[in-house]
Amino acid sequence: MTMTLKRLALCVVCTFISICIQAQDVTREWVEQHYTKREVMIPMRDGVKLFTSIYEPVDATKPTPVIMQRTPYQASPYGEGYSYNLWNKLRNYARERYVIVLQDVRGRWMSEGEFVDVRPFIANKQSNKDVDEASDTYDTAEWLINNVKSNGNIGVLGTSYPGFYATMAALSGHPAIKAVAPQAPVTDWWMGDDYHHHGVLMITDMLNFVAQSFGRPRPVPTKTQTRMKPFFQDDEYSFFLREKTLKNITKIVGDSIAFWKDLMAHPDYDAFWQARDARRNIKDVKPAILLTGGLFDAEDCYGTWGVYKALKQQSPQTQTQFIMGPWFHGAWERDRGNHLGDIYFGANTSDFYLHEVEYNFFQYYLNGEGPKPDLDNHIYMFITGANEWKKFNQWPPKNSEPVNFYLQENGQLSNVVPQKANSFSQYTSDPNHPVPYTDEINKSKTREYMTHDQRFAERRPDVLTFRSEVLTEDVTLTGEIMADLQVAISTTDADFVVKVIDEFPEDFKYSQEIADKFNDGKPLTTIMGSYQMLVRGEVMRGRYRNSFEHPEGFKPGKVTQVKFALPDIAHCFQKGHRIVIQVQSTWFPLNDLNPQQFIDITQADEKDFIKSDIKIYHEKAHHSMITVNRLK
């Protein structure tokens, strides 16, 4: 079932006619006139009290629902000021006079207690000392039901880290929590969210996280917390290449960040990380769920897909809706969603989400108003390339089938198994000259790299590029991508990066009308002919090819399988385009450097980082490929 951009535009226009009539005055001044604010320390079962800002409508004639967000990022402003969220992303609920609740999670800002990053869920709580984010949500909900005038229904939402707390709210078991919307939820910080991908440390993101002072000692609740000074002033590539080792980075970070110590103490997927995988306890979920994510979310794309799959496998009875748009991290609540970098998606997809999807979800489950969710076709998926919304009843879609793309000699890519013997492509990976993830000079990672032009990488001798023939028809790929490489390396370890790329026709260019729409009228200087749009990319640390818990080295020169998953795809490679696969072993400084020896990377010295000669096989006996579903 397809929702074209024309239909989408019509929906957005109709929505705006109804929304704007009622919500055009939801400004700061309007909120301050129509809401009161009180600040409460809500007691938890173990005696710890959590700071909570409660915004209640002045006109409480009609009881309304509670909408809540729990956050480690401040339930500010503290005191008399009102949160800007009420006239921004929560404005629809302010218009409906919802009770709006913002809470500092345990151990953060004005809340008491000890903060624990992605605190593990305790499935079988034995006493009031067994507390987690789910129990804190339960206790908060219980207090709200007994102390705030409402209709008795509570909804919880949150993006990114607050998305993790939303997932925990869904596991709390409180009967008043009827609807939960985890958005780009942190789910597994080792396997694919934020700070690791398949065991590879996402070093740029991690250092930025540390600079936000997460995990620094906080003896007492506080309204202010000083951010650490930036670790470097020059560009990120130069800084991380100069420092190179995790030992050097540890010296810079210092000894006051508990979570950095945890990272260094747990390089493998051990019990520490497994306990922090939110998917493990997604079972028998009672509230309705609206799960939201971005196809180009550089931080928590993995977690969004992971929570959805866990819900369908472990809690199939849950009333679940799932939407993935052409968005970067959190774009649905703060951006137009019509482009990312040089790539244009068409209509304003974010307004469609806020007013047609999220708002209707909470109105139905909390207020008993609005259209009934279409649970038979519960998936809204934006197909990039085609730039259209489609609705599905399962993922991957029923009308899709697996297809293999085989790497071939001479840089070719096809659906035919290679027939030659002793056929491989080779490159040398040098940690002293790593492949950058972008050709731009930046102080920090940009969100646009997720669709960035990859032509710069093809020019590198340490990047292999395989391209299909020009497509004679549209090819829409959906679902998880499985990379299956047959490799031989000259050392005992290496990383493997696989990128799936959409290469535009040589004569492609945007019309001036389109260029003006997403470039704010500024001249579009990028040459779009033969543009290589990154659609998907993922890294795998070779030592984890057989087990994430128990790493093992390579035998130099031996042909070895390295198989790993890339995040799901929903992209149409249009007629006249090419499908391109790139393979490399560094992606810097997005990823930390591998010394390319089977040693403890956290303790590696600069002299330990050595070159590795890497062969990628494409022969009949050992063929490398990617497997993904193609929509019929």
Regions found by a protein language model. Give the residues of each.
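Conserved alpha/beta-hydrolase "acid-adjacent" motif
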Residues: A298-W305
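Alpha/beta-hydrolase fold nucleophile elbow
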Residues: K149-S160
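Cap/lid segment of the alpha/beta-hydrolase catalytic domain
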Residues: V58-N146, D194-Y195, R334-F345, P505-Q512, ...
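Glycine/threonine-rich phosphate-binding loop and adjacent beta-strand/alpha-helix elements that clamp
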Residues: I343-G346, F352-V357, L366-K632
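Short beta-strand/loop motif that positions the catalytic acidic residue
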Residues: V285, L291-G293
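Mobile cap/lid helix-loop segments that gate and shape the active-site cleft of serine hydrolases
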Residues: G79, N124, R242-R280, P287
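N-terminal cap/lid segment of alpha/beta-hydrolase-fold proteins
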Residues: D25-A60, R467-E473, F554
